[in-house]
């Protein structure tokens, strides 16, 4: 398995849809997604949002975001599909084609959204992984819902992935999926990427279900993080908590991996690669945006306000975003 250097919103209870065909101008046709994807992305949210127009009609619109932008060309080239929640509880849209990829909605009930997503994912894992001032909340019912929903994602992925296909599971909401999917489809190659920090042993040990999470991630062939120290944290956990042999390699060097030896039988092991893959920047897109007339006009206004400096730089500081409010 290889992984490139690439790496939602609140549901509206009034939105309702019963099929994959929207009623807006951008209506879509449903398809059979069984064993369709040579390259399958599994994420909590879809790359498209179900929106309600002013006239009451509903349609699917492409979601903004770096992951969608980065993966779309790969999905088109490799007959890809994307499994995710459509962002609206208690609906069951059918799979459909959009922009050269197969979109496979996975329905979640209102209770599952509350317990699996708002509860365990965002009130347990998010503050724990970020070491927030606000302490995580640990609830057994949230954990059971997390297990149940992860199982459903894994089962749907097993149905959609083509024989010997590649499945890329994304982020903290779905950390049990790799192991579950491996049990269902040992033929596929599985990658997992975490889009948030991975905590050190001292923090992770607070989690009552820490061993289950570690085993879930080790179901993958390749586990990726943004930064080298996140990868090192994970490897250390596998050694201390699960007693697996590890080889750190040169995780700090691009293109190099550490490895974890996962026992699969008497004197047999499966190697799980661990590495850091920081997301890249779409430079051509930003360059094109900077050349737009509206942007250049606003730039001139700012220059005048700042005393006409020779050079002007724009910075966006993520630390201004409240860390306890995941999207």
Language model: regions and residue ranges:
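N-terminal low-complexity, Ser/Thr- and acidic-residue-enriched intrinsically disordered segments
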Residues: 4-111, 203-207, 229, 237
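Active-site proximal beta-strand in glycosyltransferases
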Residues: 40-43, 167, 183-199, 217-225
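Nucleotide-sugar donor phosphate/pyrophosphate-binding loop at the beta->alpha transition
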Residues: 57-63, 149-151, 196-215, 248, ...
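Short hydrophobic "strand-cap" motifs at the C-terminus of beta-strands
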Residues: 226, 315-318
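Residue-level detector of conserved catalytic or cofactor/ligand-binding positions
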Residues: 319-327
């Amino acid at each position: 398995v290889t992984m490139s250097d690439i790496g939602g919103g609140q549901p509206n209870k009034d939105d309702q849809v019963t099929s994959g065909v929207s009623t807006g101008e951008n209506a879509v046709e449903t398809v059979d997604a069984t064993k369709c994807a040579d390259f399958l992305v599994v994420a909590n949210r879809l790359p498209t949002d179900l929106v309600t127009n002013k006239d009451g009609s509903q349609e699917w619109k492409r979601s903004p975001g770096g992951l969608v932008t980065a993966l779309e060309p790969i999905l088109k080239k490799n007959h890809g599909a994307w499994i995710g929640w459509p962002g609206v509880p208690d609906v069951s849209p059918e799979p459909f084609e959009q922009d050269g990829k197969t979109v496979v909605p996975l329905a979640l009930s209102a209770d599952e959204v509350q317990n699996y997503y708002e509860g365990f994912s965002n009130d347990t894992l998010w503050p724990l992984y970020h070491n927030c001032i606000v302490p995580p909340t640990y609830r057994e019912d949230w954990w059971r819902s997390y297990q149940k929903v992860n199982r459903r994602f894994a089962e749907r992925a097993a149905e959609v992935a083509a024989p010997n296909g590649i499945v890329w599971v994304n982020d903290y909401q779905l950390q049990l999926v790799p192991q579950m999917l491996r049990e269902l489809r040992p033929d596929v190659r599985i990658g997992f990427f975490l889009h948030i920090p991975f905590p050190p042993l001292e923090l992770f040990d607070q989690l009552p279900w820490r061993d289950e999470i570690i085993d879930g991630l080790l179901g993958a062939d390749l586990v990726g993080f943004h930064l080298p120290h996140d990868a090192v944290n994970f490897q250390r956990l596998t050694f201390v908590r699960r007693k697996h042999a590890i080889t750190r390699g040169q995780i700090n060097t691009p293109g190099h991996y550490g490895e974890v030896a996962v026992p699969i039988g008497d004197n047999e092991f499966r190697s799980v690669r661990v590495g850091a893959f920081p997301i890249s920047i779409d430079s051509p897109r930003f360059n094109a945006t900077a050349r737009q007339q509206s942007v250049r006009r606003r730039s001139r206004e700012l220059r005048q306000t700042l005393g006409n400096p020779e050079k002007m730089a724009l910075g966006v500081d993520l630390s201004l975003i409240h860390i306890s409010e995941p999207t």
